[in-house]
Amino acid sequence: MDIKDVSNESKYIDYLKQLQGAAERAARRKGQALMANSYRSQSDENTIATTLVPAPYPPCIVSANDLEAIMISDMRLETHHRGKKIMLRVLTPPDRMTAVMAIVEDEKGIAVLLQLYHQPEESIVPATEILSPNMVCILKEPFFKCATDGTYSLRVDHPGDIIWMDGADDRIPSHWRPSMVILGENSSDIRKQGKGAVQSKKWAEALRLYSSAIQAGQNVQERQLAFLNRSFVNMNMDRPKQALLDAEKATNPAMPSEKSLFRKARALYELGDYQQSLEMLEKLTQSYPENKAASSEKDRLNERLNEQRTGEYKFKQMYKQAEKTPPLIDCVTFSAPVEIRESPGRGKALFTTKAVSAGELLLCKKAFSYSFAGDEQSTKQTKILMNLATKRVVVGGQARLLTLIMQKLYHNSSLSAEFGDLHHADYQKAMVLETDGTPVVDSFLVEKIASLNGFGAPRTSRESFLQVLSSNRDMTGDEGFKYTTSGIWLLASRINHSCVGNCRPSFIGDMQIVRATKDVPAKTEIFFCYRPPVPFESYQETQKGLNHWGFTCDCGLCLRKKATSKAVFQRRKVLADDLQRLLDYPGSGNEAKSSRLMKALEKTYLTNNDCAIRLELWEPYFAFGAHLLKNNQLDIAAKMILKGLEALVHSIIACPPNDITDGPRLKVERWGVANDAVPWAFKNLANVYGQLAPELCSAAENYAEVSYTMVVGEKETWPEVLSSSS
């Protein structure tokens, strides 16, 4: 949905073909035994960070105790060794490309490359905190892979398939144990090192040190102090579930400390449990009334609870927060007007719980996961995600999103059920959520869900709207931007597609705002378009554009396209091109020609359905109306603007210019399609009425504000936009 899919761009097609060829050569070696000295070092140059999604294979759901040991010499290439496990020791410092890598050895001393995919980025967890010499692990059901460059490796796509062991684990072979012994440091000393790492904001290092301090603790008090410190670190690593668990272990039930209560409250806030967070803060302020931080936190919590209850947001504050990078907004979800219900033939969908008016807020949702790709479209160090099975290629935020979701689910398995319930086509998901005390996270399921449910998003929809304004002073274009910033919004993902929907999403940072674009009765399913309608596109081309989601659209627009012949589409294209040339160079001699061409274009549509969108007509009508307004031809300008709105299936009573009522009147009887041009159409109509019928100005301006609200998600900034555009 507005994702920048580059699968059909020539440079990526060529690159995909190269990698597919290499993958096919690797696959032909399936079942071959390992040859001696087969490892080749990787090149340091990597201007394109490409993550290849191989053919899917399920994660291991069997306990390590129930698996049989295997050695590297017994493995076969391109094979998942089901029912097997291998113990490995890290030999070398790590390297990082798209995976975190190091050379490892098995118990017989045979070495091979280990590749861990979907690990946190270097700025969050350095590779040295993921792999370092002498670390020991058990790899369950290992995948022995021949890489696209011919090298051998053990590839790990599912983070739960690997179990890391501390030095005291009696499963570690005796000849590996001496290097694992740590001497001479007590819990207090290790905590001091952890404090130094915290002061340097080296969160992953601090996490490791505080974990060691917990193990080294000689009594309950020492361990509680280390748990409390680690809770703080987990919060800063965006792992609130782990932070909460640590804060609970740091608490003395008989006399909870000030810090432990505060850490619990903060973790509950980040988990979205605002009521429990508030209750925890109440306990804190009762026991420690001098705590000022708790008081400000309570104010913040009351704001969130009010948003959740009323749907009232301070949008200007949200814009201020969206100026930061990444644009993460401190607000909460409001969804009272909608609910999830079964839709016949469409699975789970969103329905209204009450009647809503055009422009009314249906949903304001915080992202489940969000990857901001920045505002630049640089080709250096491009992150690419290539799915070899589907041949789909995405860049930027969508490529990063997979790892972000993987890590979120891995560190909070309670989220897996709701995320895994999103549409995932025919992918068979594992029914086991945890083995060996570790969450089972299927990277291929996550990739499938992210590809089918991800949204492309601007920093703010208002920013995109203003870009259209700055590039097109006639306010006619609706560019259909595609975005590299990407996110998952769980509830909004339930909204099904229609080329002509009844609601529209907009964005302020990682908040998605969905407003009704029409008056919608209670218990009615809501729809928006996953892919904006494209002028002159045939029915077959439209359905091809929707193939990715695996359905055929049967909306009214698609059915009319299906009934329209190729000759009619060609006729429309010729007329529209001729008309555009005239509108690009307006002059007194061209106005009559433009009118004739528009009438001819109108005749290519059936006239017996006033609910049928005429996709190729609204833009020339708006452009011609804006031109006539500039030339003070007010009556005709109003007619053209209204015809443009009617082409977008708005039904409007307007007098003048139509002589259909006893006195001046302007009323939208039925709202139609809400695109970026509609607010300006109503604003231009208000400008016409400023001279033609001043008493109708306020009505036209109100409709402009309502349509602006649909497009950008709020109305607070409409006066600013008006003043900047005048």
From Swiss-Prot:
Superkingdom of the source species: Eukaryota
Entry keywords, A to Z: Methyltransferase, Repeat, S-adenosyl-L-methionine, TPR repeat, Transferase, Virulence
Known EC number: 2.1.1.-
SMART domains, A to Z: SET (SM00317)
Protein residues bound to S-adenosyl-L-methionine: Y530
One of the GO biological process terms: methylation
Coiled coil location: none
InterPro entries linked to this entry: Gramillin-biosynth_MTr (IPR053209), SET_dom (IPR001214), SET_dom_sf (IPR046341), TPR-like_helical_dom_sf (IPR011990), TPR_rpt (IPR019734)
Every SET domain range: 336-531
TPR repeat segments: 187-220, 224-257, 258-291
GO molecular function, one term: methyltransferase activity
Family stated for the protein in its record: Belongs to the class V-like SAM-binding methyltransferase superfamily.
Functional summary from the UniProt entry: Methyltransferase; part of the gene cluster that mediates the biosynthesis of gramillins A and B, bicyclic lipopeptides that induce cell death in maize leaves but not in wheat leaves. The nonribosomal peptide synthetase GRA1 incorporates respectively a glutamic adic (Glu), a leucine (Leu), a serine (Ser), a hydroxyglutamine (HOGln), a 2-amino decanoic acid, and 2 cysteins (CysB and CysA). The biosynthesis of 2-amino decanoic acid incorporated in gramillins could be initiated by a fatty acid synthase composed of the alpha and beta subunits FGSG_00036 and FGSG_11656.
Protein name from the UniProt record: Methyltransferase FGSG_00040
Source organism per UniProt: Gibberella zeae (strain ATCC MYA-4620 / CBS 123657 / FGSC 9075 / NRRL 31084 / PH-1) (Wheat head blight fungus)
